[in-house]
UniProtKB/Swiss-Prot annotation:
Keywords annotated in UniProt: Ribonucleoprotein, Ribosomal protein, RNA-binding, rRNA-binding
NCBIfam families the record matches: PRK08569.1 (NF006342)
Protein name according to UniProt: Large ribosomal subunit protein uL18
HAMAP family reported in the protein's UniProt record: Ribosomal_uL18_A
Biological role: This is one of the proteins that bind and probably mediate the attachment of the 5S RNA into the large ribosomal subunit, where it forms part of the central protuberance.
Length: 174
């Protein structure tokens, strides 16, 4: 508990485990738009956010649940859906006239081949400029969902569905 005159109470969002203020300060000082990737068990959310003195402004966003509009019926929380959501986000942002940003993964652990980097690969493949190293991207087999098709054996058409959804997304924005 806060006892004594020298005890410093952390900011509320830091206490809740929601904000890393040291990283946020570095991102704000760069004065570049942030590409914010957040994942949950069921979805992946991507936003293009610009910092202002009044508060952050969201310019563009995509959520993996939007993939249903393009015929994707698979699980929206996996690596395949993360890539497709990144692709959708990148094409939406380019259509609105934005060209790039820097990646912000917040308090999520950075591990190569994760859903965060699958989303980043989709963003980069769309032509949206985000500085990154290709070494962190998951393999193309994982992005297409071949590991899921191999595991499920009998009824997984995920790689074919991935290609069809990818073509529909490109068709809408070309």
């Amino acid at each position: 508990m806060a006892t004594g005159p020298r005890y410093k109470v952390p900011f509320r969002r830091r206490r809740e485990g929601r904000t890393n203020y040291h990283l946020r300060l570095k991102l704000l000082i760069s004065k570049q738009d942030r590409v914010v990737v957040r994942k949950s068990a069921r979805n992946v959310q991507i936003q293009l956010i610009a910092p202002t003195p009044e508060g952050d402004i969201t310019y563009s966003s995509a959520v993996s649940s939007e993939l249903a509009k393009y015929g994707y019926t698979g699980v929206t929380g996996n690596t395949t859906a993360a890539y497709l959501t990144g692709l959708l986000f990148g094409l939406k942002s380019l259509k609105k006239g934005y060209e790039g940003g820097i990646l912000d993964i917040g308090l999520q652990a950075s591990s190569a081949g994760s859903r965060v980097y699958a989303a980043l690969k989709g963003i980069v493949d769309s032509g949206f400029e985000v500085p990154c190293s290709p070494e962190v991207f998951p393999s193309d087999e994982r992005i297409r969902g071949e590991h899921i098709a191999e595991y499920r054996e009998e009824s997984s058409d995920l790689p074919e569905q991935f290609e069809a959804t990818k073509e529909k997304i490109f068709a809408e924005f070309s």
